[in-house]
């Protein structure tokens, strides 16, 4: 619950050398470590996914920037060819080829932009999964803590009753 790396048992429970108490402490410690490691492992996998998606986005953005430069170049070439065509110094087929290339690369930019957005959505969903995992873990820890505190209260009451009984018989 407090993001600790180990369980802190009450001093009275730490001092008890009864084999059942020692075994219970060890068991709870092992369960705690296993659950914490599993939780951290899940979060680590999700963080790696975010990192991979971020790297993919960077690559896609680089491709998009390159395509945008290409579109700019095609746009300038189309403009120049239209002027030359008007003066009779250019081939109409050449202009149509450049216009097709311009349209094709513009479509590729749109596809890259869409893919980037999809990856950004996946990052958001993965971050939400991490938050949900942390919340679920906290809820489980709080529930387990409540159970343990109830058991501890019960045991302490029985211990007090037993001590009282022993004190009266002595």
Each model region followed by its residue ranges:
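Long, charged amphipathic alpha-helices with heptad-repeat/coiled-coil character
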Residues: 17-169
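Hydrophobic or amphipathic alpha-helical targeting/insertion segments
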Residues: 1-3
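Post-kinase regulatory C-tail/linker adjacent to protein kinase catalytic domains
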Residues: 9-17
């Amino acid at each position: 619950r407090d993001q600790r790396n180990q369980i802190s048992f009450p001093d009275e429970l730490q001092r008890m050398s009864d084999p059942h108490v020692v075994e219970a402490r060890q068991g709870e410690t092992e369960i705690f470590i296993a659950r914490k490691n599993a939780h951290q492992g899940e979060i680590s996998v999700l963080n790696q996914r975010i990192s991979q998606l971020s790297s993919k986005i960077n690559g896609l953005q680089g491709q998009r920037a390159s395509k945008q430069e290409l579109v700019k170049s095609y746009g300038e070439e189309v403009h120049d060819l239209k002027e030359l065509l008007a003066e009779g110094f250019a081939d109409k087929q050449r202009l149509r080829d450049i216009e097709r290339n311009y349209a094709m690369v513009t479509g590729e930019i749109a596809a890259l932009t869409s893919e980037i957005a999809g990856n950004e959505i996946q990052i958001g969903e993965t971050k939400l999964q991490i938050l949900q995992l942390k919340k679920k873990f906290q809820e489980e820890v709080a529930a387990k803590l409540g159970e343990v505190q109830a058991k501890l209260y019960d045991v302490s009451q029985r211990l007090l009753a037993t001590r009282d009984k022993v004190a009266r018989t002595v």
